[in-house]
C-alpha cells in the first residue's frame, strides 16, 4: 500500500509543490517509509524543461525538513509518492518517482504489485534495458517506455516526409493511450499509476 498523487495547475507560472506536499501529508498513512516528488513547468519551451525531483526516506515532513528542498521543485505540474514497501528494496534507490529518459522524459509513481514482474524484468534485460532496482515499479516504467517508443517509431515511419528519430516525433494522445493499453495488457496485477510525460503533462 502506497500513496500516489498528480497535480496540474492551470497557471503555467504557478508552483504545485505546496499542493503535492499537502496531498502527500494527507496520504501519509499509506506509506511512512519514503517520499518522492517530481515536477516540471508547462510555461517554458518544452525543449528547455527539465524534471525536478526530490526523494528521501522517512515521512514527508522529514524529506522536507530543510525548506530549501521544496524550492528545488519548481513547476506547475507534478507527481508524488509515499512508500510502503511491498516489492523490491527499501533503500533510497527504490524511492519513487522513477525516471526514464527514452523515448522522452518520463517519471512514474506506482501503487500496487505486478504479479509477473520477474518475467517482465527478464524480458527487459534481454532487450538491453538497464534496471537500477528490484522494484516492479521500475519494470512497469520501462515496459511503458518501450511501448511508447515503438508507437512513436511506427508513427514516424507512417508520416510522409517526416524524417528523424522517434525523439523528433511529438507524443500524440493516440500514441500515448495505445502505449498505456499495451502496458496494462503486459503488466499483470493490481495497481494504480501516475506518469509525467515530457512535452505532454500528466
What name fits each language-model region?
Residues 1-202:
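Conserved short alpha-helical segments that host acidic/polar catalytic motifs at enzyme active sites
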Amino acid at each position: 500500500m502506497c500513496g500516489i498523487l498528480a497535480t496540474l495547475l492551470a497557471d503555467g507560472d504557478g508552483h504545485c509543490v505546496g499542493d503535492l506536499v499537502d496531498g502527500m501529508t494527507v496520504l501519509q498513512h499509506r506509506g511512512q517509509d519514503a517520499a518522492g516528488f517530481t515536477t516540471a513547468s508547462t510555461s517554458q519551451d518544452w525543449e528547455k524543461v527539465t524534471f525536478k525531483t526530490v526523494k528521501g526516506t522517512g515521512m514527508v515532513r522529514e524529506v522536507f525538513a530543510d525548506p530549501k528542498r521544496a524550492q528545488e521543485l519548481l513547476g506547475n505540474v507534478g507527481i508524488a509518492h509515499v512508500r510502503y514497501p511491498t516489492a523490491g528494496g527499501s533503500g533510497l534507490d527504490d524511492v519513487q518517482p522513477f525516471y526514464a529518459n527514452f523515448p522522452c522524459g518520463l517519471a512514474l509513481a506506482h501503487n500496487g504489485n505486478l504479479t509477473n514482474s520477474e518475467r517482465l524484468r527478464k524480458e527487459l534485460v534481454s532487450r538491453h534495458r538497464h534496471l537500477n532496482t528490484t522494484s516492479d515499479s521500475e519494470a512497469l516504467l520501462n515496459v511503458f517506455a518501450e511501448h511508447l517508443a515503438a508507437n512513436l517509431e511506427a508513427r514516424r515511419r507512417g508520416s510522409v516526409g517526416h524524417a528523424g528519430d522517434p525523439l523528433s516525433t511529438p507524443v500524440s494522445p493516440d500514441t500515448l493511450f495505445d502505449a498505456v493499453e499495451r502496458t496494462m495488457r503486459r503488466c499483470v496485477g493490481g495497481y494504480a499509476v501516475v506518469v509525467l510525460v515530457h512535452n505532454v503533462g500528466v
